[in-house]
Amino acid sequence: VGNNTIIDNGAIIEGNAVIGDNCIVRNYCQIGGGSSIGNRCIIEHCAEFSGITMDRVHLYHYMELGGIIGTCTDIGAATVCGGLRFDDGITEHRVRGRREKPKEYANSSYLGDFSRTGVNAIIMPGCKTGVYSIVGPGVLLNEDLPDNTMIMVEQQTVKKHWGPEKYGW
C-alpha cells in the first residue's frame, strides 16, 4: 500500500494486491487478488475490480470490471464488463493487424487511456476501448471501439396515459 492511501469503511482486498500512492479505496468496494492499482486512483462504493489500473482511474458505484484500465479513465455507475462467454470460448483479438487468441485473460476488458463509460454501460467479454473513447449510458458494447470515438444509444420511447384507474384496486 502506497503513501497517503486511504483504505476504509468495509473495503475488501482479496489476497495480495499492490495499491499505489494517494489512492482512496473505501465503502464496500472489492479488489481481487493479484491486482495492481496505480497512483491517485479512487475505488469507491461497491465497485468490484480485478486486474491492473494505471494512474488516476476512478471506479464508482456498483460497477464490475476485470482487465486493464488506462490512465485517467472514469468508469460510470453500474458499468459491467463481462468476463465469461456462454460458449465458454476465448475471444479472438486483433493486435497490430494480426488475429490472436491469448491463452490468458482473453475475455478481460481493456480500456484505453482517457476513456469513460456512462451509467449502465455494458462491455462484453474481450472488448477493447480506444484512447479518448466514450461508451455512453446504456450502451451494450460488443465490438472494439476505436480511439477518439464515442458510442451512444439512440432510444425511442412511447408515452401513454397512466393513472390510478389502471391498477384495479
What annotation goes with each model-predicted range?
Residues 28, 43-169:
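Glycine-rich hexapeptide-repeat left-handed beta-helix
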